[in-house]
Amino acid sequence: MQRRAPPSDEAPGGLRAFVTTRRAGLGALVVLVAAALGGWALRGRFAPDLRADPDMILWPDAVSVTGIAPWVGGDLKDVALRDASLDGGLPLDDPELPQRLARAFGMHPWVRDVVRVALRHPAAAEVELRCREPVAMVAVPGGLLAVDAEGVVLPSEDFTAESAAAYPRVSGIQSSPVGVAGSPWGDPVVHEAAAVAAAVGPEWRDLGFRDLRLAEHAARRGWELVDAAGRVIHFGAAPGGEGEGEPNVAAKVTRLRALAADPDRPEWSDLTVPP
């Protein structure tokens, strides 16, 4: 009987040949895997110590905020951080921390823009804001709602009866806001009224106006300013909506300033036609 020869260690494709020819590569791979596992082990060992470092934990009292307007009531910083669940210790090494802080402050109804968020070490943060400015109070059943120049509803609970009286009162509005404070009212009529109130600005107080209302018998939608004595100034269209031949908002405001200086101004004035 013919005896079968034992398998040769040098047979091509054999395990020993593979190991022999790949020995250098396998050695390098083992070193890389060991280094990676060692890195993860070190990270797991020392990461808790990094987070335990008080200089790496950001607390609310180390967050400074600039740009908060004087008409903003309450503690804007505390409310913004609390509502975003960021009122605990925050790891300074979180790469998304600046964005999280920006989102938290940007969600506050008084905040128009988050201008800048800067982190510092030891753990501190600087946040710069631009706040919305109230320009009018819209009369609704049960009270007044503040709006800015773009018709965004503001937190009316921050106003007293006395402070609310310093702003134009928009009357005759039939709608209600479509969202919460910090959202646009959602009615073009309210947005127009807010634009008129913003354009009139300081002249409102100088002229002693009481109400801003829709013109009752105008051929096209326009606005009237009414003072405490019942005298009316027809302002006309909101800024940007002027008809053909109607003066622009700058010309109207110039006329308003002249009327403010005239103690004997008439019962009715019309800013949509030349004086």
Indicate residue ranges for each PLM-predicted region.
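Charged, solvent-exposed interaction patches on well-folded alpha/beta domains
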Residues: 1-64, 82-275
